[in-house]
Swiss-Prot record:
This is Histidine biosynthesis bifunctional protein HisIE. Residues 107-210 are annotated as: Phosphoribosyl-ATP pyrophosphohydrolase. Gene3D superfamilies: MazG-like, Phosphoribosyl-AMP cyclohydrolase. It is an enzyme of class 3 (hydrolase). GO terms for molecular function: ATP binding; phosphoribosyl-AMP cyclohydrolase activity; phosphoribosyl-ATP diphosphatase activity. GO terms for cellular component: cytoplasm. The keyword Phosphoprotein does not apply. It comes from the Bacteria. InterPro entries: His_synth_HisIE, HisE, PRA-CH, PRib-ATP_PPHydrolase-like, PRib_AMP_CycHydrolase_dom, PRib_AMP_CycHydrolase_sf. One of its GO terms (biological process) is L-histidine biosynthetic process. Its main location: cytoplasm. It is found in: Cytoplasm. The lineage of its organism: Bacteria, Bacillati, Bacillota, Bacilli, Bacillales.
Amino acid sequence: MTKYKIDFSKGLVPAILQDNQTKQVLMLGYMNQEAFDKTIEDGVVCFYSRSKQRLWTKGETSGHTQLVKDIHVDCDNDTILIDVIPNGPTCHTGSQSCFNTEVPFSVQTLAQTVQDSAQSNNEKSYTKYLLTEGIEKITKKYGEEAFEVVIEAIKGDKKAFVSEVADELYHLFVLMHALGVDFSEIEAELARRHHKRNNFKGERQNIEQW
């Protein structure tokens, strides 16, 4: 508990929930000290309900709980931002966000799309077709797309280049899925390199730092 110095002197503090992957703002609730402590202890978001005058675990009735991934406190120590993994829609209306905002597209969205297609029963799915064919087929397609990116770069056709890069990224994520590689592993490696200093490539074959 000592990690977080939150000012509960006024009783309640606002707590904002944000999707850990998409960074979409999901909802605003309020916590007192007891609700915050329970959130830390259970690993799922618990608010203090002003209408019910009691602790209220988000999703206690619907089952749409909010799994806590990280907690941030603002500079005045009186507002909480919680990164969560939502277990279903956040809003009682069935919307993913109480603010009805669209989910911002990200590479995580692409990864999720590939995963959803892989698990679907849609036999017409191109993703499912590639995964069924296996690594050899996927790597061949990825190589073709990478070559097309190079060609469009040489030609200087920006619009075509962007289109081919999008195709290449899609096939890269299919390949990653086939190999069981999560994008978070790539992010971790990029972060490791980013935090290194005094980079000089020299004759190295592998770029271990930027």
